[in-house]
Amino acid sequence: WGKRVFHCPYCHGYELGKEGIGVLATSELAMHHGLMLPDWGATTLFVNDAFEPTAEQLAQLKARGTHIEYGAAARLVSQTEVGVELVMQDGRVFPLVGLFVAPRIHLSPLAAQLGCELEESPMGCIVKTDAMQATSIPGVFACGDVARAAGSVTFAVADGAMAGLSTHRSLMFGC
């Protein structure tokens, strides 16, 4: 992700200080970031022509202190220590210490080719697993970003440990 564009407020929100945090909407999922990030600093939600907030959503954002900017983003200009500049199509420029995005997940076709059951998450399709990381296909286990919408190294390592344990048990005991 680099040093100034992020996907997870829990992983990176605290690193940015108190000023100039941006959320670039790619879908309505940006509301999640727009409501969460004010805990870490002054936040602007750039609607980016991706969705139109409802009156209720606008009230929620206002209550959290999130500023809203309309219009489409044109480009992101990288800077050094300071952060980035988000340049809008109409020429407005917003200096930011960091920018959050909520991209959709795109799975490899392998799980579907194996016949694994998939499920829709807020960020895209993931492989459905149980607590032991087993998929709907006996002997096939999934972990990390393929089986969890929240992209996190910590979760991936924990899920991987469980999938490894479960795979070994499956090979030994047929369960």
Q: Where are these predicted regions, by residue range?
A:
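FAD-site-proximal beta/loop scaffold in flavoenzymes
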Residues: 2-15, 104-150, 162
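A conserved FAD-binding loop/helix module that cradles the flavin
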Residues: 31-33, 143-175
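Gly/Ala-rich phosphate-binding loop of Rossmann-like dinucleotide-binding domains
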Residues: 38
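A Rossmann-like FAD-binding core segment of flavoenzymes
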Residues: 41-127, 172-175
